[in-house]
A protein has these predicted regions:
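Catalytic binding pocket for nucleotide-activated donors in carbohydrate/polymer assembly enzymes
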Residues: 142-230
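Carbohydrate-associated surface elements
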Residues: 28, 50-51
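Nucleotide-sugar donor-binding and catalytic loop/hinge architecture
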Residues: 38-42, 54-71, 93-96
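Conserved donor-binding/catalytic core segment of Leloir-type glycosyltransferases
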Residues: 23, 62-81, 90-91
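Nucleotide-activated donor-binding/catalytic signature segment of Leloir-type glycosyltransferases, i.e.
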Residues: 102-107, 112-136
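Short hydrophobic "strand-cap" motifs at the C-terminus of beta-strands
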Residues: 25, 72-75, 104, 129
Length: 245
C-alpha cells in the first residue's frame, strides 16, 4: 500500500512499474489524476480504505482516581497538526469543568507559549507527559473518557489514529481546521463523535454540553465493525484477493 503525503514521482513511478498492482487511500487519488505527478500509473492503483479496525489491546479501562479525562497521544507539527484550537477550547472550559486535558507526544517546543498560557489557566488539569512508549499511550487512551483528535491542516493526509479511536468505542472529539478535512465522512458515521470547527463561535458551549452527555459511554467493538464494515481485516483481505487474483 503506497502512502500519501510527500510525492517523489520518479521513485514512486519506478516502484509502480515493478508492481502488478498497488493500493492507495482515497486521499491519494488526486496524485494519479490527469496531469498529476503519478498520472502515468493510474491503471496500476486501486483505492482501499484504512484496514485499521482491530480490537483494542486489553488494558485496564479506568485509572485509579475518578477524574474525567480527555486524552491526545501524538506528535505536533507546525502547519500540519497544531494544538492551538484544543488549548483555546479547554481554557474556555476552565478548571471548574472538571475535565483534565492530557496531551502526550513531541513537538511542544514549537508551541511553548500557547502551552504556558494554558497551564496558567488550567494548572494541574493540563498535563504534558511528553513522548511516551506505545504501550503507555495505549493505556492512557484506554483510561480516557474522551479521545481527542486534531484534524490535519492538509486534505491529503488522514490520521490513522482516528480508526484506533473508533475501535476503542470511546467518544471522539475531532477539531477541524480546514473545510475539506478528509476525516469528516468517517466521523459522520460514528455516533459518539463531536466535530468542532476552528472559529466556531459557540464551540466551547457545545463542547461543555457534549462532554456531559457522552461521559461513560462506549460502543462495543462489534458495533463499531458494523458501522465500518469495509475497514475490518476480512473485507480488506477480500479486496486484495479481488484485485490480485
Amino acid at each position: 500500500m503506497l502512502p500519501t503525503g510527500i510525492i517523489r514521482p520518479p521513485a514512486e513511478l519506478e516502484l509502480l512499474n515493478h508492481l502488478a498492482a498497488a493500493f492507495i487511500t482515497r486521499q491519494a487519488v488526486g496524485d494519479y489524476a490527469p496531469g498529476a505527478p503519478l498520472a502515468a500509473a493510474v491503471e496500476k492503483v486501486h483505492v482501499l480504505d484504512f484496514p485499521s479496525l482491530v480490537p483494542p489491546a486489553a488494558v485496564p479501562n479506568h485509572a485509579a482516581d475518578s477524574k474525567n479525562r480527555c486524552v491526545f497521544c501524538g506528535s505536533l507539527y507546525p502547519g500540519l497538526r497544531e494544538p492551538g484550537f484544543a488549548l483555546e477550547l479547554f481554557r474556555a472550559l476552565g478548571p471548574a469543568s472538571g475535565w483534565p486535558l492530557t496531551m502526550a507526544g513531541g513537538g511542544w517546543q514549537y508551541f511553548a507559549a500557547d502551552a504556558a498560557q494554558t497551564k496558567a489557566v488550567l494548572g494541574e488539569q493540563f498535563e504534558q507527559p511528553g513522548p511516551v512508549p506505545a504501550e503507555t499511550a495505549r493505556t492512557m487512551q484506554a483510561q480516557a473518557d474522551v479521545l481527542l483528535n486534531l484534524g490535519n491542516a492538509v486534505a491529503n493526509q488522514l490520521p490513522s489514529k482516528l480508526f484506533d479511536y473508533f475501535a476503542a468505542g470511546k467518544p471522539v472529539l475531532h477539531l477541524c481546521v480546514i473545510e475539506n478535512d478528509p476525516a469528516l465522512p468517517y466521523l459522520a458515521r460514528y455516533p459518539l463523535a463531536l466535530v468542532l470547527h476552528q472559529g466556531q463561535a459557540d464551540a466551547a458551549d457545545i463542547l461543555h454540553r457534549w462532554l456531559g452527555e457522552v461521559c461513560g459511554k462506549q460502543l462495543p467493538f462489534g458495533e463499531v465493525c458494523d458501522l465500518f464494515p469495509e475497514l475490518v481485516p476480512q473485507a480488506v483481505a477480500a479486496e486484495f484477493v479481488r484485485w490480485l487474483m
